[in-house]
Amino acid sequence: SACLVGSGDVYKRQVSNPPYFVDSLKCPDQKRNTARHTDTLTLEDLLQDSRKLLAPQGRIALILPYDQKERLTDCIRTQNLYLSKETSVIPVPGAEPKRLLAELTAEPPVFPTFSSQLTIEIARHQYTDEYVSLTKDFYLKM
């Protein structure tokens, strides 16, 4: 995103599945490491550049590991962004959330943050109706 900053372009919608492994085991494949680890693109850097490229009423959508929620909250505050929606993604009922879907805005939201929960499976390969509804266009056997 650094190459776009300063171009004068702004975007109404930004969607990112950023690198999010921090200080974790790496593999021999450098390209894979670059895509998956925060060595070359931290969440702070991503949000700083995204904020600069965000239209006044635009939105940034992210998926992160759930354990990065506090870090995201700190970054949002630093970049003068606002959390408008958050979804905790849970693999199976009773499990801890594994992912966080977050939507950020540059302007304070009119309503409080909308929080929801998405459970993926009821049991192994028995997907919830909500998950099927959201993903059926992307899978052949859903």
Over which residues does each language-model region extend?
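Phosphate/oxyanion-binding loops and surfaces in catalytic or ligand/nucleic-acid-binding neighborhoods
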Residues: 21, 79, 107
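Alpha-helix initiation/capping motif
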Residues: 35-39, 93, 124
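Single conserved hydrophobic/aromatic residue that forms the stacking wall/gate
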Residues: 1-11
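Flexible, active-site-adjacent loop/turn segments at secondary-structure boundaries
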Residues: 2, 19, 32, 112, ...
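Mobile active-site "lid"/loop adjacent to the S-adenosyl-L-methionine
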Residues: 12-13, 18-45, 49
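SAM/dcSAM-binding transferase cores
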Residues: 96-142
